[in-house]
Structure formats: structure tokens, C-alpha cells
Amino acid sequence: MFASLLLAALPLLTHAALTYRGADISSLLLLEDEGYSYKNLNGQTQALETILADAGINSIRQRVWVNPSDGSYDLDYNLELAKRVKAAGMSLYLDLHLSDTWADPSDQTTPSGWSTTDLGTLKWQLYNYTLEVCNTFAENDIDIEIISIGNEIRAGLLWPLGETSSYSNIGALLHSGAWGVKDSNLATTPKIMIHLDDGWSWDQQNYFYETVLATGELLSTDFDYFGVSYYPFYSASATLASLKTSLANLQSTYDKPVVVVETNWPVSCPNPAYAFPSDLSSIPFSVAGQQEFLEKLAAVVEATTDGLGVYYWEPAWIGNAGLGSSCADNLMVDYTTDEVYESIETLGEL
């Protein structure tokens, strides 16, 4: 009888939990300074990190800027947020932008005071910066699970020296940044990640890694994880099928785990700038759609050898619901009530 009951229950066990079920909540302290707070699914006001941890989310991504003009996302800001993440029992993923402001495929501006003319000087500055960041967290007894050397660097990093006109320079910079992490005082060395945009495009992913590794400046042993962004609203070509192929090829070609480190799905998108991918076109723009998208995305990651996790980008950024896209609202929070959506729990159960 027990055996038959057990067998009957087995179909409900659709997949094992991903290693990383994460969210980027970098904006939290700024939002709290503006007076915002959050409510759980029972309508009770709680700290956002508590709501996320209670939902099963186990890792938090934080962006780090070098010398921001107003202190936003600098090292002190991130220490304050990381202490709360640690207290909530979640792991920490630091996303080093290596800039004083946003770094992405269209802008990789070198921090103020760092060299833009001498590669040797810039390598040394980058090494000392990643070393300092890690040692500061070590001094505060905060472990770092993952650290990425740059953010969406398919077009290079630390421009102009790290532009794609010289993949040798890109490789040398990544090597220096990685070794600042490896030489730090952290008791456990973080997993070092390289993060590119357009994770669905195997051609773009492979071109970057094949080219930069061929220079001999970046060694395969310098880093541990591939990180990719996957946003379905920026290209009709960003199908789940393409992502599945890209992740599988990345892992099999270079023998490293893969993580989807940025993604979104809208609850409202009346005027998308681009057609949505064909194999996602049936998913509604709603909370239920967020849930369905996350489950399908998780299935792709889980089906990939060494596919480790999914991070949702800025699910609670009230006041910026479009999150830079042409969609009206990609949040997992109802910004009219400050209450989280059920999709938060879906993310925590992936």
C-alpha cells in the first residue's frame, strides 16, 4: 500500500531544485530610503530579503560600482545589503560592473582614476580592486558564493583598452581580475564568473570565448562559471530552443557550469518593441505567465549538464517597473499595493 502511494506521488516530483534560485535586489536600500516597503503574500509588511528567503529563494545578486558619484552601489552600500542577505540565510553573488555607473553592451566606461592609456597599469588597478573587494568582505565575515568580472562584457570591458579591437587585452584584464579574487583572504574562494549578454546566441557566446581563450591571456582555469543574460523581449530570435542549444554547447565545449543570471517576464507589455520569440508566444503577460515562463526556463537550465540556476533581475524595483525594456511591468511586486506576486514563490521552488 505504501509503495503504491509513493509511486502515485512520483509524477508530482517534476524536477530537482536548481542550485541557485536567485534574484537581483541591488536597488533595495535606495528604495527603502525613498520610503518603500514590501508585503508578503499574506499582506504583512516584511523585509524584502525575508520575503524572498521564505519563498525559497536562496541566492541574491548585487551590482557593485567602483566610484559612483552619489555612493549608489559602491562597496559600503553592498556591504550593508550583504549583511542582511547573510542574516536571511541566502548566498551572495557580486556582480562587478567595473565602472562608476551602469556597464552593459553599450557602455563599459573605465572608472575614474583608472588608466585608459596603459594596459599594465589598468591590469594592476583591476587586480587590486577585486582583491580589495574580496578582502573587505572577508574582514566582515561575509562569504561570496559567486563573483563576476564585469557585467555583460560581450563587447568588452574597461573601454577603450578592453574593447573588442583587442581580445588579447580583454583576456589579460579578465586574468588580472580573476587573480585578485584568487589571492584574497576569503576562506573559500568564490566561483569566478564571466557574464555575457544574449545567452540564447551560441554563435555570439562561442565567438567571444573562442577568441579570447585563443590569445592565451585568459586561461580556462581562471574562471569557473558561464553567466548569461536571457531577455525574451529584446529579440524574436531569443527562443527557449536557442537558449537550450547555446547552454548545452557552452557546457560541452568548454566544460564549465552555466547560470542564467538575468531574466524577466512581463505582467504587462501592451507595446513591445520587438516580437516575442515563437516558442514563448503562448505565455500570457501576467503573474501566471511569469510562473509559466520561469518553469519553462528552469526546465531548460535543468536539462543542461551542469546547469545551475536562474536569477531574476530586479523583481521589486518599484518606480522602475519596465526595468529598461519596452514592456510596462516586469516586476514580481504589485506596485499599487507593495505586495509580492505568487511568482516569487515559483522562483523559489525552481
UniProtKB/Swiss-Prot annotation:
Which residues of this protein are catalytic? Answer: 152, 262
Q: How does activity depend on temperature?
A: Optimum temperature is 40-65 degrees Celsius.
A molecular function annotated in GO for this UniProt entry is: glucosidase activity
- One Pfam assignment: Glyco_hydro_53
Activity's sensitivity to pH is recorded as: Optimum pH is 4.0-4.5.
Q: Please write the reaction equations for the catalytic activity of this protein.
A: The enzyme specifically hydrolyzes (1->4)-beta-D-galactosidic linkages in type I arabinogalactans
PANTHER family, per the entry: ARABINOGALACTAN ENDO-BETA-1,4-GALACTANASE A
Q: What name does UniProt use for this protein?
A: Arabinogalactan endo-beta-1,4-galactanase
